[in-house]
Each structure stands twice: as structure tokens, then as C-alpha cells.
Amino acid sequence: AHPLVIEKDLAAANPKEFVAEYKWDGIRVQIVSHSEGCRLYSRTGDEVSKSFPEIIKTIQGNFVLDGELLAGINNDPKTFNDLQQRLNKKAPSEKFIKKNPCFIKVYDVLFFNGDDLRDKTLIERKKVLNSYFSTNRSPMFLSETIEFKDWRFLDKIRDISNKQIHEGVMIKSVSSPYIAGRPRGKWFKWKRNPKNVDAIIMYAQRGHGKRSSFYSDYTFGVFNKEKELVPI
């Protein structure tokens, strides 16, 4: 998805031709399930199944789904920092899993029961997902769409309270097929307005997969009233 250029992209876009979803603050995953079991893959193609055994053992079916892996339980997401605890464990214990549960928000489907749905429109693919999630599929949950009539209303939703665990909204053309990469004009990400804070870098950690050679994950700290440096 391309970052949204408000003056350019919204001016030419009809709200009726798009759907909106929350941009969840987790990691993007593909869920590949078939007769031999289930596997999870990151956006870089790295398999992360062993880090989330409690998820893959409960998923059954014949499909490839696209979604967001989040920390939390019962469809109630926590922060990305909470998820980071799980990402650092390649073989988590049962005790650790219970203390740091995770689930998946699903927002698209590529294959279902042997059918390749990538050339279908987004609306057609959503119908397949709505049917599949008409029954409980925990620890997977359908990522809900946001009802909106105009861009001004969606703008307010996008920048809603910091208590909401999302980075903004995704805007997707209802007629769009599932296309790899970042095709312009079909999917847009509209992030929240940035917030400013004076902080101190406390820790730096290497990323995962292709980002493992870079220090891409940082923990910042601020001073509390007792003048103690605490992580945020």
C-alpha cells in the first residue's frame, strides 16, 4: 500500500469506491493452511510458525489468508512492545505463551478451498471472509471495516485517541484484485498525525529476517516525577 498523499489521492478518489480498515500495529503475516498443517510467514517470507505454536495448532482448513499478528487475547489488541516479547522467542514455553498471548486480525484471502481468489475484486474476497468468519475462528478474527460517508469523517477516525491500538487506517479500492507489491491507486495507508515527545534512547535491538543486520527496534525512556528514567 502507498502512503496517502491527501491533496493528490483524496481529491481524485470517490469514497463510495473504497472501503476502510484499521491499520493495526503488529506484524503482517500470511496464514498458509492445508491438509498437512498450518504455517505462518512474515512479510519478508520468513517462517515464524515456531514462535506461535498455540496459533498454528488451532487453525484448520485449506486457504491462504493475509492478516496482522497482534499481542492480546479475545480480539483485544495490546501494543507492539507486547508483541515484541513473543517475536524474540523462537521456542516459547507454555507458561510464557499464557503470559503473552497473541491472535491474528485477518483482512484478505488469496486462496480458499483450492480456488485462486487473487484476481477477484476486494468485495468478492470480503464475502468469502465474511462467510468463513460467520462462526468462531479464534485465535483468528476478521478485521472489521469502518463505515464512512466522506473523507472528513474518516480523517477523524484515523486520528482517534491514542488508547486505540492502531497506526491509522487503510483505504482499499472495492474493485481491486490482490496484487503483490505497492500498486498505486488501489490501496493506501493513511497514518495518524505524528505526536512529539522528548525521550532518551535506552535500548537498540536488531530487526528480524532481512532487517537482522540493522538496529531497527528501539526502546525510549522519559523521566517520571521522581526523576527516574522509565521505558515507554
Language-model segments: which ranges?
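Catalytic cores of nucleic-acid ligases and guanylyltransferases
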Residues: 1-232
